[in-house]
């Protein structure tokens, strides 16, 4: 009897080890950049871990869940960005939980996720790329929690009749305009709540190398996904962005340049391959 019990316990331990090992093998993770680059699991209900190999998961990479047989997806409170097509054509996906940390939903995310019935867009989201949530045939309820993000063309288009976006009362006009500009026919209605304000401008002044005498940012040493460059640094106005100042920053997806900026130097944003949207100020005079 004792031998049988020991054997059963041993087999249970073995199964547990195999399961844990299998879960670890589900992910293709780039620790150098905090990017989840691939999913090798069996589908079903999927919970993405906040850490892999001791490093945080900051970005869901291009096409990670494209066409996968997942039924629900929970993303951790570390994820800042969904890259292009990260989650799309998932025909069985009925539920998704997006984290409050999320800032950027890049183009074609949730495209043709035909079983998805509702979604909540967290307050920190600043940008939703083109064709995201397009052809979601069952999506009837979209809830926005924060200030109106930039919404690109064809987002939330070709949804079922009666699809409704519930938005903060104090942002109603902004959302109506954003949906109209995107070409969406979704009904935009007040949610009964005001916008949750999230301060995520993406910088600390020490991350900029700045020449105060000329007002020039000469380099940027941060890792922001969304960056709103300040009008002043150390009390001096920002007038120029120097040559190659932001070159090869692979995290940067959304950029707002400040009023007062006049010049952008040569190759200032060279090889920023994930940069999806830039807001230019009215004061800009020259781009190198």
Positions of the model-derived regions?
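Sec-dependent N-terminal signal peptides of Gram-positive bacterial secreted proteins and lipoproteins
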Residues: 4-22
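Short, surface-exposed terminal/edge motifs of secreted or surface/virion proteins that either
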Residues: 174-180
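A structural signal for leucine-rich repeat
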Residues: 111, 134, 154-158, 179
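N-terminal low-complexity, Pro/Thr/Ser-rich intrinsically disordered segments
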Residues: 23-27, 195-208
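Structural signature of tandem-repeat unit edges
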Residues: 24-32, 41-58, 68-81, 90-104, ...
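Consensus positions within tandem repeat domains that build extended binding/scaffold surfaces
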Residues: 61-64, 83-86, 106-109, 129-132, ...
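STAS-like cytosolic regulatory interaction modules
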Residues: 180-201
